[in-house]
Amino acid sequence: MSKLYYSFTVFFLLIVSCSTSDDKDILIAKGGRIYGGKASYYASEKSDHIFPMSVISMYDQRATAPIFETLLSYDEEAQKLVSNLIEAYSFSNDNAYLNLKIRQGVYFHADSCFTGQSRKLLASDVKFTLDFACSRHALNEQAQLLTPKIIGAQDFLNDTSVDFSEGVRGIEVLSDSSLRLRLIDSSQTILKILTHQSLAVISKKAFETYGNTIANHPVGTGPFTFNQKSAEGIIFERNPNYWRSDNYGNKLPFLDTLMIRFQKEGEDIFDSFTSQKTDLLSAIPINEINSLFGTLSDAKEGKNILHKVQHKKGVKVNFLEFDCNTAPFNDSNLRKAIYHAVDRQEICRDFLFGEGSPAEQGLLPSVPFFKYTRSIKNPYNLRLAKSYLRKSSYKEGDTIIFHVSTKEGSPEDKWCLNLVEKLRRTLRLNLRLERKSFNEKMNLIQSGLASMWMSGFISDYPDAESFLMPYYSKNKGGSSLKNSHFVSLEFDTIMDKARAVMEPIERNEYFNLCVDILNQKVPVVPLYFEDLVVVFNLRLRGARVNSFGVLDLSEAYLKPIK
């Protein structure tokens, strides 16, 4: 009898063992959510950077967001900061320093660099991240963010040795779970800056292992882990040890796989979406949605795909930008001539079909964190434009190349062509348009081979300072945002005052003065503010996009439409 019982017990345990091994990854979600599946979408531009401090565009940010997480995030609906990788923070009474408490139970992705060592997120990782963002390292494009804020950051940036053994003296590790930032100014805007996707936390151990090849080995704490990057795109896989859960208690994320696809020549992104090979469209003019998708009743009858549109009053500003350091645009009169020759209302009315808002007051949109305090007349004035042109040193016949990264035939491309024709006709500028990919255009700009180009900017954190810092000449480092080489001591002085003020109304007024100076000196010609439109296949639930253009798929799941 005992032998029979023993044999049965062993047999039962073997069955349970095999069953457990086969079913261990099967997860059942509450609240109608579903685990598993693969979601994908096409990127509007190919991303070359999967490292937070190297990103130079919204497309790069979207590629890093699944892997890397920020210390804080911004809740747009509540208009407040939300703890992320830190669970608490506090300022000293005099705002001289900021203490951060690291969230417990957060681990970096499994990677060979941690062999035999803990993957737990520590304060030393956060210090290393912030030190890196203040360094001269070739991978760092973000020195402008923290060097004006933290004591010792500028000195560290000036150190050509790029030695991380000590780092920034104003960033102090107090324990494994806490650190202190000693601050230059008292405005508390550093909290908003810490929501910046380019300050997402990286692993100190990963950098010690991979060094300058760290961008090929992205290791973060986010909902997805890096699988591979190829000519096809970037593949991410579910992080089984992710720390967050949703409101139902479901362990996130739901998706097994996420893919950001790179478009090949001849591929139709819209066809891929309508055939459900991809799950969202990240760039589509809102005026074309009805013509492309038809009506809701059509979709229910199977004539087209059921979809959901997220339309955000975006904070993206589109503008013309000049290299103010070299001819011909080191001549402010030529810049002013173009500033007054552009009809912003025409662009929005005739080419953007009423979508977007003319940027007639300046570079900043009117948003919760910035309000214009004065009215400005429509800057379009051909008589004034011609007056400035006569004062300029421009010689008729001199060729000016206008670099754009537009898709031929798109509304944006059409207004760019119209602008070239109009400036030729009204100001007799010998202007020529050249189309380049985004990365090609950026390479030309950063190498000094472009003098005028079409550009766009999305605020990376919810503060007016974000829009204005690229024109602050004390803003040190190799940031790609400083393309115009604009220098104004008057602008810098007012920015210094704005950065030191706590009172919101006074601070807002200083920022208005900064906008006035930009309108007068014209390093850029603000054109229009663009709304962000993302179209989701209705089977993809829980996906979100914010006004800063970052896609959040941490709570996204696939659910068949019945």
PLM ranges: what are they?
Residues E76, L157, V162-S178, R182-L252, ...:
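Gly/Pro-rich hinge or "lid" segments in bacterial periplasmic/extracellular proteins
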